[in-house]
Amino acid sequence: MGDEEAPSGSIEDRINHKNWKWRVSGLEELTTKFRNSIEGSGPLFNEWGPQFKKILADINPMSQERALEPLSAFIDRCDCVNKFAASYVGVLVEKLFASTRPRAKEKTIECLLLTIEADSAEPVVEALLKGTSSTSPKILLASLAALTQALKTFGPKQIPVKLILKQFSPWFENRDKGIRDQASELFIEIYRWIGKALIPLISEALTPIQLKALQDQFEKLPTDPAVPLKYTRSEAAKALANASKGIQAKPEVVEEIDPYSLMTAVNILPKLTSEFYEGLQAKKWQERSEQMDKLVTILTNTPKIETADFSELCKALKKILADVNVMIVQKAVVSIGLLADSLRGGFTSYVKPFITPILEKFKEKKTSVLQSVHTTMDSLVGKSISLSDIIDELTATMQSKVPQIKQEVLVFICNSITNTKKPADITKVTKQLTKIFMEALNDTDSNIRDNASKAFAALGGIIGERAMTPYLNQIDPIKAKKIKDNMPAVATPVTITPQPLAPVDLKDIDLPVSSSNKKPAAATGNSKSSSTTTPTGRSSNSSPLPPPPSSSDDIKNKLIGAGIVNNEIIEGLGKTQWKDRLQAVDDILENVKGLTADSINGMSESIIQLLCDKPSLKESNFQVLSSIFSIFIQCCKNDSNFTQQRCANSYLTTCIEKLTDVKLKEISSELLFSTGESITPHAVFTSIYQFTSNHKNPKIIADSLVWIQQAIDEFGIGCCSNGIQQLKPLLDYTKQCLESTNPDVKKSAIKLLCTIKINIGATLTDFLGDVKKPTMEVLDREFQKIRDQKPPVPNRQWKGMPPPGSAPVQIEFPRVDISVKLTPAIITNLSDANWKTRSDALDEIERIIIDANRKIQPKLGGLIPALKNRLTDNNQKCTITTLNIIGMLSQAMGGQSFEKHARLLIPGILLLLGDSKKPVRDAVISCMNVIVQSDLGFDVFIGSLAAPMIQESAFTRKESLAWTIVNVTNMKAAPIPSEINTLAKGIISCLQDKSAEIRSLADNLLSILCTQIPLIEFKKELKHVKPASQPSIQTILDKYYQKTGQPIPPPSKTKQSTSSSSSSSSTTSQQSSTPSSPQPIRQQQQQQQQQPTQPQQQQQQQQRRSILQSNNGASNCEFIIFDINGKMNRQKTNQIPSWHFIEPTEEVVEILQDQVLQCFTEEFANLMFSSLPSNSQHMSDLMIGMIEQNPEAIISVLDILFRWITFKLFDTGLASQKRVLKILEILLNKLIDSEYSIGEYEASCLVPILLEKSGSATNEQIKQIFKQSIQQLEELCLPNVLFRFAIEMVTSQNWRTRVEVLNVMASIIDKNGASVCGNLKVVIPLITQNLNDSQSKQSSLLCLNKLYSHIKDECFKYSNISQQDKILIIGNNNNNNNNNNNNNNNNNNNNVQQQQQQQQQQQQQQPRKSLSTDEMSTQLIGCLELLKNYSITKENIEHTVEALKQFSGLMANGKLDDVFVNFAEEYFLVLTSILADTFPQVSKDATILRLCKYLIHTIISILSNKVVAKQCNVRCLEIVLNETIKLYSLAESNSSKQGTESELSKAFNQILLRILQNCNSTILFSTLLQMMSRTDNDQSIQHPGKYNDLLLRCLLRATKSLTTPSILEELNVETVLSEINSFLKSNPSLDEITRKTTKTLTSELYQNRTNQVVKFTKDIISKGQQQKYQYLLNLLIELVPKQFEDLINGNGNGNRISSGGSNNNNNNGGRVSSGGNNNNNSGRENINNININSSLDSPINDHHNSNNTTTTTTRSRTSTGSSNSQQQQLPTTSANTTTTTTTTTTTGKTQSTLSTLKINKEPRDYSGKTDSQKKELLIEIFKKIGNKDLTLDGIHDLYFFIREYPDYDITPNLNSSSQQFQAYITRNLKKIKDSMDAPKDKDDEVVNYQERLKVIQNTFYNQHNQPSSQVVNNNNNNNNNNNNNNNNNINNNNNNNNNSGGNENIAPQLSNTASMASNTLQRLRTLNPDQNSGSNNNNSHQNSPSTSSSNDLNSTVASLRQRLAQLTSKSNE
């Protein structure tokens, strides 16, 4: 062959290639691509990032190791490693650490360290900690090494030590010394960082030796503080920023680990018994002291106590504090301190009552007591409460007259202040403490004064010297000096610098603005000229309108001339028939729509006057009036001269009034909107005020308020707030409506005020001061609900509206002083160590600004410095929130006020441009844009922009350059040269960057700023550039500057171009013409640079979303935001269990709108919520088109679409409901066609409200549509899901809804059976409640009737139903049955014969049977579907249990047997799968245990049905056997098996027994053999050894049953033999046990079906299939002697088939002799006495199974006589038998033999017993049966007892044993009865004696411990000797007997017995040589007994009887 093909193709193909060399080639190229990548993100990284998990899992070690190289390059270049780290770090730990490659471990650790450096430490630490718990020593050792290296490199800030300390104990207990040493190295590294704090954390878990060894290593460590060897990327960027500012890096502060957090809480209350509390109340102090000692001991030994109710203990301790015995009091104080240490925060609520009593104990003289009190108080204040919590108690105690108390309290306060970790708690009570100290300083006791000075000094260390000055000035100078002297000596753990009072600045005061400083009115859009314009919005110089026509004739003539009307139309307007009027109006509408804009100008007034005359606005027909309104709408939209006075006033009042008309509401609303667009909305509002203010119809007022609210949303608040003068009438009108008594009016007014509040903010409250207090409280609650809402974007405009570019018109609200709300606590919390506290403080500040309506005074106190510190916060959320607050402040304060703060904050903001997290950079850009858009403009940034450009960070440079290019044009004034010249340094630095993109951006910025920055500034910076880079930069400078230093003027002829884009020279000239506002030259390039700053998700959404086209355009655009996982994510985060409400609230609408915007484009979402009919119809058309064209997209948003449909069902408009229901109908039909199944979550979004609305619908057409939709849902939803939602609605307040729901439930039950109902105990009472309601009673009866038809009288058990109702329920059921069964007897004539009547009856029964079969199938399918949708939730478990109950009830009816067979496989599959899923949790949840029991019971009940079991196929049995044996193995393998698992093990055993007993034997053997063939390849088997053992036991048990005639009849021997051959073929190398089991099965088949086996074998040979059945033939040849081959070769009856080398002749057919024994076989054909040993389980051992030992016994076969012969049991004593027997265990054989020897078959005398004696006797009998050595003897006792007392009930005694053992007892009783009742034959004694001889032989050979070979040799020798002497005589005798007839068959048996006796006697002599002389028959081998010598036989038998008695007694001993 030639050389291997060189790798080629794409990287993807090579990496996925099967050849590892190709994969390595692909990995090398991928590494190169990563290293050459300039970008840190993009398609390359997004494509390959997720694939490293698969690449690293390569099975080839070489390829796997080489995969680390591209991973290393990927991590080095990628900016978003944290997005992919979690996917590959686990593979690194699991696969690469276990690699066999020498350097794989080191490279893997390098990759993990690189990942941590890329700010992705969390997944790495998690994976490594998981690796430390691995069972593989290699992975464990490498994980520990990686943790050590990571901690050493990055420190505990990135590698949390706390997580390591939670699981370190097993490392030091590992047997591998390397692991223990590596763990020691890890802890040495931890000690480097946290020092001695580590020792108490590990002292309890380590042995003293290990701890001592570690401490020795700790002492050797250097004392220098540990520092990380590397920074992460984010830390490096901050360090670089600090370095550029000259800020020194601070040493890393290691988080202090509290050992308390690692401890396990213990509940101590159970230890405090009632004796403890009684002892505390004892009179003797010794008893009280003893109990307190006990409490102290418990608390001392419990460092962490579980939180519980300690109120009783605290009450007892409080009483003890008042005890007279000081020592007991001291112990109580100590106990309280220990409780505080152990409970900490959990003890806070109990502390207060103890404070004063404990403080009073400071008066005690004993030092130990004082020390205990101090310790306890320190514990209370440090662990449970703060000093500020007990300041009142301290103040009261300081009023004590005992000096010692004051002195000690001051010492305690000083210690608390000095040791505090929360200075803020001290600052809260500064005033109270200073008051205490100043009083104590004046005390007469010097010790009190000294302690007060120290405490005062400690307080000064907290609040600072400046804050102390006011207090010190009030004190005597000498005392003040003493305090100052003590202050430096006091430790100040935390220093808080008080904020100095800022000097008063005029800029901080709001002054009235003089008129000279105001901007021109034209600029604001609020000039007086605008307020004096005409209402039409036209300017004063516009041409006046022509005068209107004066008469109606002129109007008609004018309109006829314009072609709008004709005489026919005018005549039609006045006709009495509404259809004629409607036709005329529709003609006018068509003509108006056809007019152009120029044609309709000036015609609107005439049209309106014509229609107002005829048919007039009082038209009674709504269709005519609707068309008139449509004409008015066209006039409003198309006539530019439309005015209010001449046009709108004619119809406005009528239009407002028609808002209440359901049929005209939509068109009236649309007309008002169109009118507002033509004449300002404010004019429409004014008309509403005037018309509705005093109107008597409250509905008109309410609907008008609703329309105003919609108008504000669609036009914006500007439509009514051009000044406070226009807003005030609206507010006055709304407040007037608030006083209305009508709830609808009041509710609408509140909603309108909420809308205004959303738009204008908190200032609205200023206008509501005169509102009544109760109403105001309601408003406040509503305002609280909408506080986070933002005003919607206006989508309508009116004529005269300010252009979009102009400044929005706003109401000037007063600025709010928020300095009062910015409390010191909030400012302090901004610096808290806990990020959540900081985040909460920032959120509170943001809330304060929002509540102030973003109009605040520039009085911020210490907020700005605190915000500056938060810009460098480690938490991303805090940083983003800080940036948002800064942007809000710039807008809320105004540009001039915020300027000084901006210059302080901007440097920190710009540094964040280099943050590696995209959200942070986006927030920075957004904040900067907001600042620029304020009055400050770009100017405030100029002096700070150079800093981010100088940094060596690609992010910082790119973002700062791109932003500067875009915003440099927003400068408000000419830049200051000193500031803008600083950009020269930044531009020069960026021109040297390695990134071409950054250099291009810098070039672009230089082209803009070349006119602002002189060349000399660039020359200065060029000197610091490397000489190699200077020429390229100089070339760029030469492009924009002349040699004289002046900038080159922009070219006017040519176009300047760049590598990416170009712009025209004319544009450049125009842009550069104004130096104060320079424009960028490369606009396209700027746009490209802006794109990376936008969030990537937004870009993708913009690409996916397409703007909806107008009504006149195409409508087939995509409007669904397709997300394949969106529905799943919404289901997980769903917070509303059931989408059901009586009326949609604001919260519901808000939730729905947010969800719709997530799934649909914004334009389409607006259409979905539009109230205009045109928009709604357009939306409906688009939706229906999408449903037809792209159902997949619709299904992805099906839940939200269902919710929107239900929301729209609440519309009052009939047309709107029809549109929505049409969408629903089409949607459901499409889902049915697609065979889609609606899940429970999707159904919850639709079904509840649909059911509710189906009852409330009044329109018949709508009601029918609802019913049709529910029928469609019955096809789409699972019946139990639909039923569950229906049962929830059955309690509805609307009786119509209840009726519809009950009908739906009846339909579901009728179609699917009662199993869909779930828990009948809950369902039936809910249904029966409606029996008391007259409206819903009929439906309730129908539902109960359907239920009764399935479960009969069971439905009456769960509720009290009256007898009358029961009759109705049952009667309805009977009527239904009678209606279904048509009786045709009335059609028969009297002369019809009886035979014809019977035929007719048979014909009538046929359809009934088929119907019954269909019903049963439906019921079974219903139960099956319920089980298939099982999931492990409590509710579903109950449904499943109920379904199983229903199924068991169905199976109890024997009619289902034949039908169930068709579903058996599916049922078994579902039942076993549920059982397998739930079994692992059975010990954790009682509900799951209950479910498992029902499942097992169901399976057993199925298999107990013999009709079903016999028809189960191989697949059914395989399903049940596989799962049952798996679970049985799992239960048995649990070493700590509990009662539950033991009980389930028995249940699994019952399943196996039912299969073995009831299933078809052929199918059973086929299944078992096939399963044994597949066992080795099944990876799902957890315990294969146990699994195989159980399979073999099942096969053995099935083999035993082959002696049963019924099983033999159904057995197909050919099939079983074929399966045996297949099994042997697929498993050529079997273990000994399996092979022996296979032999046993084959031998049993041969013994019981010899003819069929022989025939099958002959057929194989005749067909030439020996090769195919080679394995079976080999087994038969092995089992059967060599003569078997002669038989199957066709030798016939004349052949001799012998074994063991004996030569025997048979003249009467073929005879078989084995081992020297010759038996006559006249009853079987050919061959039947070849004895083959089989290993079978003893039934006694099955019951007494203590060691699961399988006992091998020798079974003798029975032979059947030809005509008059009887069954005989033949002995088997061949060498083969002996060999097989000796291979079994001695213990099992001995037990079986002893139990056989102890059987007493003699009759018992149990007559004359009393009842009590009978009971006792029966107990003793069953005890004997329970003894495995006396079982059979006990069964004989039981037989004679039953024969004596046949009427006595022994069932209770039988039930005490297992079902298996009961069956065993029953079988043996039957055998005993049969044997007793059978006639006694002459050969019984011989046969029985023969059996006894066999038992004795086998027993004693085993007892004498002879080797197997010796036993076999002895047997063979003895048998050969005896048989050689006796064969001739026996053969001759046999020949004679064969000719004499069947009555002389005893002779051969006597001969055989004599031979056996001789053999036995010889063996006994061998075993007992000392007794040979005493035996009368010691030479029996010389004189063998003959059949003709009865004397010799008798003497031999007598001798053996005597010997038998001796040996029996010996064996018993």
UniProtKB/Swiss-Prot annotation:
Which spans does this entry mark as compositional bias, Polar residues?
1940-1949
Q: Where is the composition biased (Basic and acidic residues)?
A: 1799-1809
Gene disruption: observed consequences:
Mutants exhibit a disappearance of supernumerary centrosomes and multinuclear cells, and increased sensitivity to the microtubule depolymerizing drug nocodazole. Mutants overexpressing mtaA exhibit supernumerary centrosomes and a cytokinesis defect. Mutants underexpressing mtaA display inhibited growth and a reduction in the number and length of astral microtubes.
PROSITE patterns in the record, alphabetically?
HEAT_REPEAT
Query: Which GO cellular component does the record give, naming just one?
Result: endocytic vesicle
Offer an example of a GO molecular function term for this protein. Answer: microtubule binding
Q: Which Pfam families match?
A: CEP104-like_TOG, XMAP215_CLASP_TOG
HEAT repeats, residue ranges: 115-153, 158-196, 200-238, 348-386, 427-465, 724-762, 816-854, 857-895, 899-937, 977-1015, 1240-1279, 1281-1314, 1317-1353
Q: Which GO terms describe its biological process?
A: centrosome duplication; establishment or maintenance of microtubule cytoskeleton polarity; Golgi organization; microtubule cytoskeleton organization; microtubule polymerization; mitotic cytokinesis; mitotic spindle organization
| Compositional bias per record (Low complexity), positions renumbered to this chain | 524-543, 1053-1106, 1372-1406, 1695-1735, 1746-1796, 1913-1939, 1967-1995
Region annotated Disordered, chain positions: 512-557, 1043-1109, 1372-1413, 1695-1809, 1905-1949, 1966-1995
Claim: Cell division is one of the keywords in the record: yes
Cellular localisation:
Cytoplasm, Cytoskeleton, Microtubule organizing center, Centrosome; Cytoplasm, Cytoskeleton; Chromosome, Centromere, Kinetochore
* Keywords of the record: Cell cycle, Cell division, Centromere, Chromosome, Cytoplasm, Cytoskeleton, Kinetochore, Microtubule, Mitosis, Repeat
Indicate where this protein is primarily found: cytoplasm
Q: Determine the domain of life of the protein's source.
A: Eukaryota
- Gene3D superfamilies assigned: Leucine-rich Repeat Variant
List, alphabetically, the InterPro entries matched.
Answer: ARM-like (IPR011989), ARM-type_fold (IPR016024), HEAT_type_2 (IPR021133), TOG (IPR034085), XMAP215 (IPR045110), XMAP215_CLASP_TOG (IPR048491)
What task does this protein carry out?
Involved in regulation of microtubule dynamics. Regulates the interaction of microtubules tips with the centrosome and cell cortex.
The entry describes its oligomerization and partners as:
Interacts with eb1 at the microtubule tip, centrosome and kinetochore. Interacts with lis1 in the cortical attachment of microtubules.
The family this protein is said to belong to: Belongs to the TOG/XMAP215 family.
Name of the molecule in the record = Centrosomal protein 224
Organism the protein comes from: Dictyostelium discoideum (Social amoeba)
